[in-house]
């Protein structure tokens, strides 16, 4: 039986891979959707949480989106400490288009992964 951590890590990696594939296709909406889903999955894992915000910063830089760039720089500072202390807004999609403090509903398929076996 796979552990919750293994399943969570694999699903996070899949979402990141899908985001990269969307970027290569030039599908910015799908890229962001997969980055947001990766963010939801990454919140309990400090390293992956930070890496997801780095990817979101890259998204903002490629789009020359000043708001996203600034938002991700701020989130990069607080991502790891938030994970370590358990003080992160569960379900938050991580983009600068939403408050960094706002909890959000988690899609059912991601909730199943977060709940584990």
Predicted features along the sequence, with ranges:
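N-terminal alpha-helical interaction modules that lie
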Residues: 1-36, 40-43, 63-117
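TPR repeat positional signature
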Residues: 15, 49, 53-56
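Extended alpha-helical scaffolding segments
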Residues: 50, 58-67
């Amino acid at each position: 039986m796979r552990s919750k951590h293994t399943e969570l890590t694999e699903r996070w990696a899949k979402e990141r891979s899908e985001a990269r594939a969307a970027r290569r296709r030039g599908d910015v909406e799908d890229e962001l959707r997969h980055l947001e889903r990766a963010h939801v999955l990454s919140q309990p894992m400090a390293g992956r949480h930070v890496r997801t915000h780095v990817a979101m910063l890259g998204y903002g830089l490629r789009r020359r989106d000043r708001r996203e760039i600034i938002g991700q720089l701020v989130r990069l500072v607080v991502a790891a400490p938030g994970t370590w202390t358990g003080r992160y807004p569960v379900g938050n999609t991580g983009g600068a288009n939403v408050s960094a403090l706002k909890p959000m509903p988690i899609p059912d398929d991601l909730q199943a992964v977060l709940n584990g076996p």
